[in-house]
């Protein structure tokens, strides 16, 4: 039998090893052996909750174990106050979405807001259009994007455009999305691939990542319910969003292609009514996905 002193030393050593091992093997939620992230949450996923209780919903995001977020507004809070709330919950805002007309009429104002929020990226997720998106609207948008990119770059922020499906209207030998890509300066304009809004208009995310290597710096990981109608409207019932791994997306191939193409940031965006229930399972799926 060991002496009390030796037993205490043995227990202390074992505890130290356990603590060291725990620290050395700790990982970020939502990442695993294959998928390394970094993964965050687009806060629009919880827009209904934020509209009722901003501090409480921010605490819920923290409770998911998430460390990074993408913004879609500040829910009537000044940027500095919203930033303080993020920081009090150990959350870091990487990127944010702003209205197209803000970029068109006063990109400097967007730059100042993004700077106040500590963002690395500021982007746009919808180009206003009437009826089917057309060439004139695509060219005009590209001009706005280049100008916004130049202004944001002066503040150390990168502009991005988030795909939304309607821009894949046929054009020449390709699509209007190809035209926007061709008309935007890679030094000033990056892209955020929303997987749902690539598959919805019957496009292939893997082929698009291969075609536009290094252009997509951000990605929305979003799954689609089996049987969801597909078209070029850029619109779909929000409840066609489902927990990652339960829909139609071929995640191993998509995530492998994203890594190879240089995607730097990934965000779960789930617009469904049950998003808060989906998010833990989606994070778990990313931890276990193999590619």
Give residue ranges: language-model regions.
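C-terminal motif of bacterial Sec signal peptides marking the signal peptidase cleavage site
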Residues: 19-22
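Aromatic-rich peripheral "rim/lid" segments of glycoside hydrolase catalytic domains that contact
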Residues: 257, 272-291
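Active-site acidic/histidine proton-transfer and metal-coordination neighborhood
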Residues: 68, 75, 100-191, 276
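Hydrophobic faces of well-ordered beta-strands that scaffold small-molecule active sites
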Residues: 37-42, 69-71, 93-98, 122-124, ...
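Bacterial N-terminal signal peptides that target proteins for export
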Residues: 1-11
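N-terminal pre-domain/capping segments
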Residues: 2, 24-121, 214, 284, ...
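Active-site beta-loop-alpha junctions enriched in small/polar residues
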Residues: 44-46, 72-74, 98-101, 127-129, ...
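Acidic/histidine-rich catalytic cores of soluble enzymes
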Residues: 154-248
């Amino acid at each position: 039998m060991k002496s009390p002193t030796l037993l205490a030393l043995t227990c202390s050593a074992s505890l130290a090893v356990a603590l060291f091992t725990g620290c050395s093997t700790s990982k970020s939620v939502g990442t695993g052996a294959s998928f390394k992230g970094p993964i965050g949450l687009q806060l629009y996923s919880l827009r209904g909750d934020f509209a009722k209780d901003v501090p409480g919903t921010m605490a819920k995001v923290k409770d998911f174990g998430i460390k990074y977020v993408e913004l879609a507004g500040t829910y009537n809070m000044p940027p500095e106050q919203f930033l303080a709330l993020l920081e009090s919950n150990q959350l870091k805002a990487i990127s944010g979405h702003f209205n197209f007309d803000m970029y068109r009429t006063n990109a400097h104002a967007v730059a100042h807001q993004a700077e106040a929020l500590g963002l690395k990226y500021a982007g746009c997720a919808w180009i206003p259009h009437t009826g089917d998106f057309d060439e004139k609207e695509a060219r005009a948008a590209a001009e706005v994007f280049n100008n916004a990119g130049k202004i944001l770059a002066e503040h150390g922020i990168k502009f991005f455009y988030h795909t939304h499906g309607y821009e894949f209207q046929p054009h020449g030998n390709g699509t209007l999305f190809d035209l926007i890509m061709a008309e935007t300066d890679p030094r000033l304009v990056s892209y955020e691939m929303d997987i749902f809004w690539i598959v919805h208009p019957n496009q292939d995310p893997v082929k698009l990542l291969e075609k536009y290597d290094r252009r997509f710096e951000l990605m929305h990981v979003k799954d689609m319910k089996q049987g969801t109608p597909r078209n070029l409207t850029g619109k779909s019932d929000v409840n066609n969003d489902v927990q990652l791994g339960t829909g139609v997306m071929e995640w191993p191939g998509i995530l492998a292609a994203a890594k190879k193409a240089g995607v730097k940031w990934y965000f779960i965006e789930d617009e469904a009514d049950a998003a808060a229930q989906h998010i833990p399972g989606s994070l778990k799926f990313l931890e276990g996905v193999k590619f």
